[in-house]
Structure formats: structure tokens, C-alpha cells
């Protein structure tokens, strides 16, 4: 089923008789019918945050995509949580979107995951002029939640760009990228492994078992023999990835 968003665009007004033009920023309902591969939201409990765990989880999705590109649509798409203040209040919802729904935010959000048809029924089809909205709403259109900024920055570094689509409920931005243009996908290489002890593992990066049935990723030290085209890893890494000597590993 199509996904429903607001799309931010420019509406051009022109009067030939008065000889003037004016550009207006507007939001209008937008049905996203084209296929895409959507990245889900990652939530880590506070006790497990830090030490690169969040970025490892996020990057592992791109590493899986690089190993199995035929399973995905060429375009990757992600929604980012919209801005809320320190009191957990959404200006976009409180001062704009909730006027269209006889629901609280969480109920509307819950229903939208099951069936978003009610959004098309509830919101007028004409464009909304942004400069007529409350200032505090204007300032947060397409602005990520403070807790989502690390994920937003990470995605931007992986060539994801805002596409003008805005979440209907919280005003959060949507980003997209061609999977083939994601740096972690472009840099992926496969090599057979050898398990080594007492050598200088002089490189550091993502190492993956690319198997569809046993996919796993670590970020660890390794070494590479350029002449033999062989990856040297420790027994600890091999065990974590369920790899045996001669198995193929992917490095990014």
C-alpha cells in the first residue's frame, strides 16, 4: 500500500498584470507509490548504548545490503523521528497536525502503522502555506528529534539526503539514497580467511560473515595479505562470526 507523507515544495505565484512573482514554501499530502527498501528505527536500551554499539547495529544493515543487493529495491528510504522539546512535546503535532484528528498522538501513530488510509481521509488535499503556520511549527518542519541526531548524522555520511517528504504526525524528515552509492556498500570486498595468532593485526574495520543464514558483523582488527588476497583474523573473531579457515568474509 502507498505511504502517506507531507511533501515540502515551492509554489510559484505570478501576476502578469501586476508584474510580480512570489515563491511560497508549502506542505501538501503526498502518496509515495514507488517501491523502496525502508530502514526501520533502531532503539537501544540506555544500558547498552555507547562503545559504538549503535553505529555497529546501524552499519550492519548496510553491510547486509551490500552482501545481498538483489533482495532490495535500489533505493533505500528512512524516516527520522521529528523534533520534541525537553518536555517531550511535539510542536508540529500540538499546533498543526492534531487539528485534523480526533486522536491523541500515540493512538494516531499506532493506527498509521496498521492502516494509514485515515490520514488521506482526515487531511485536506490542498497545500498548506508554511509561512501562515505558527513560527514554532515552521522551525521544526523536517527537524530531527535531539536523540535522533546521531542517527541522522550517520545516515548523511552514508550519502542519504533529505527528499522533501515529512512525517504527517511529528514533522520528522525522510532521507533516501541509492544503495549502490552508500559508501559501506561500495567498499565491500570478499576474501577467504585464515586464522592467525601472534601476528600484527594492523587494520581495523567491519568484518562480516555474509551468509544469509548466519549473517554477523564485528568491528575488529585484522590483517590482509595483498599477494595471496587472504584475510587474517583472530580465533576470537572467527568464533564470533562462525567462520572456518577458507570461509569467505566480507570487509568494508
Question: What do these predicted regions represent?
Answer:
Residues 1-41, 100, 105-113, 117, ...:
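Conserved acyl-donor/pantetheine-binding loop and adjacent beta-alpha core of acyl/acetyltransferases
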Residues 22, 41-44, 49-65:
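Conserved acetyl-CoA-binding loop-helix of GNAT-fold acetyltransferases
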Residues 33-42, 62-81, 91, 138-142:
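Conserved GNAT acetyl-CoA-binding A-motif
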Residues 57-58, 70-111:
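Glycine- and acidic-residue-rich phosphate-binding/metal-coordinating active-site segment common to enzymes
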Residues 92-144:
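Aromatic-anchored, glycine/proline-accented short structural segments
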Residues 129-199:
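Anionic-ligand-binding alpha/beta catalytic cores of soluble enzymes and soluble regulatory domains
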Residues 203-210, 246-252:
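Short conserved beta-strand and strand-loop elements enriched in small hydrophobics
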Residues 214-246:
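Short beta-strand-centered segments at strand-helix junctions
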Amino acid at each position: 500500500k502507498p505511504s502517506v507523507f507531507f511533501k515540502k515544495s515551492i509554489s510559484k505565484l505570478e501576476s502578469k498584470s501586476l508584474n510580480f512573482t512570489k515563491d511560497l514554501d508549502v506542505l501538501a499530502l503526498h502518496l509515495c507509490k514507488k517501491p523502496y527498501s525502508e530502514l526501520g528505527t533502531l532503539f537501544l536500551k540506555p544500558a547498552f548504548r555507547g562503545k559504538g554499539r549503535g553505529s555497529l547495529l546501524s552499519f550492519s544493515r548496510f553491510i547486509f545490503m551490500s552482501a545481498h543487493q538483489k533482495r532490495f529495491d535500489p533505493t533505500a528510504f528512512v524516516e527520522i523521528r521529528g523534533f520534541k522539546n525537553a518536555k517531550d512535546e511535539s510542536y508540529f503535532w500540538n499546533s498543526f497536525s492534531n487539528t485534523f484528528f480526533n486522536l491523541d498522538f500515540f493512538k494516531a501513530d499506532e493506527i498509521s502503522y496498521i492502516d494509514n488510509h485515515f490520514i488521506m481521509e482526515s487531511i485536506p488535499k490542498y497545500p498548506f502555506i508554511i509561512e501562515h503556520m505558527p513560527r514554532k511549527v515552521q522551525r521544526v518542519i523536517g527537524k530531527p528529534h535531539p536523540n535522533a541526531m546521531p542517527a541522522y548524522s550517520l545516515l548523511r555520511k552514508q550519502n542519504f539526503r533529505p527528499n522533501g517528504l515529512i512525517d504527517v504526525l511529528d514533522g520528522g524528515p525522510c532521507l533516501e539514497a541509492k544503495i549502490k552509492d552508500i559508501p559501506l556498500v561500495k567498499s565491500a570486498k570478499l576474501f577467504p580467511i585464515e586464522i592467525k595468532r601472534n601476528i600484527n593485526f594492523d587494520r581495523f574495520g567491519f568484518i562480516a560473515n555474509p551468509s544469509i543464514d548466519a549473517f554477523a558483523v564485528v568491528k575488529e582488527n585484522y590483517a590482509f595479505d595483498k599477494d595471496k588476497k587472504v584475510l587474517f583474523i583472530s580465533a576470537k573473531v572467527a568464533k564470533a562470526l562462525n567462520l572456518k579457515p577458507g570461509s569467505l568474509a566480507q570487509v568494508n
